[in-house]
UniProtKB/Swiss-Prot annotation:
Annotated source species: Chlorobaculum parvum (strain DSM 263 / NCIMB 8327)
Gene (name only): rpsK
Protein name: Small ribosomal subunit protein uS11
Any one of the GO CC terms: ribosome
SUPFAM superfamilies named in the record: Translational machinery components (SSF53137)
Family membership noted in the UniProt record: Belongs to the universal ribosomal protein uS11 family.
UniProt subunit comment: Part of the 30S ribosomal subunit. Interacts with proteins S7 and S18. Binds to IF-3.
Residue ranges that the Swiss-Prot or TrEMBL entry lists as coiled coil: none
UniProt keywords, alphabetically: Ribonucleoprotein, Ribosomal protein, RNA-binding, rRNA-binding
GO molecular function, one term: rRNA binding
A Pfam family: Ribosomal_S11
Described purpose of this protein according to its UniProt entry: Located on the platform of the 30S subunit, it bridges several disparate RNA helices of the 16S rRNA. Forms part of the Shine-Dalgarno cleft in the 70S ribosome.
InterPro entries named in the record: Ribosomal_uS11, Ribosomal_uS11_bac-type, Ribosomal_uS11_CS, Ribosomal_uS11_sf
Length: 127
């Protein structure tokens, strides 16, 4: 016999947190965590309905950031520090979207890993 499905209880979080933005050439992923590193909300371009080459556009990045930020804002988060990783095209749009939802951005850090002459990069594209 089927039981009634329970709605997941929304837990209030601390008003401070961290936004991790990973912007690759193919996708963008936004994860919002509390001060201890526990995930509060997350979103990606694919989760928001973008497919293929549309996933790495600034607009997809904006929509993705808004979706994650709204969920975190509803749970009580107000101040965030932003960590950006990757060379993607929608890095600036993602930060503007966070501010548009109502989260106050306190600091922005670029933590893109840079090789000290490590692996050989892929060959140049010829279109």
């Amino acid at each position: 016999m089927a039981t009634a499905s329970r709605k997941k209880k929304k837990v209030k979080v601390t008003p401070e947190g961290t936004v991790h933005i990973k912007a690759s050439f193919n996708n963008i992923m936004v994860t919002i965590t509390d001060t201890l590193g526990n995930t509060v909300s997350w979103s990606s371009a694919g989760k928001n309905g973008f497919r293929g080459s549309k996933k790495n556009t600034p607009y997809a990045s904006q929509v993705t950031s808004e979706a994650a930020a709204k969920e975190a804002y509803d749970l009580g988060m107000r101040y965030v520090d932003v960590l950006i990783k990757g060379p993607g095209s929608g890095r600036d749009a993602a930060i503007r979207a966070l501010q548009g939802v109502g989260l106050e951005v306190r600091s922005i850090r670029d933590i893109t890993p840079l090789p000290h002459n490590g692996c050989r990069p892929p060959k140049r594209r010829r279109v």
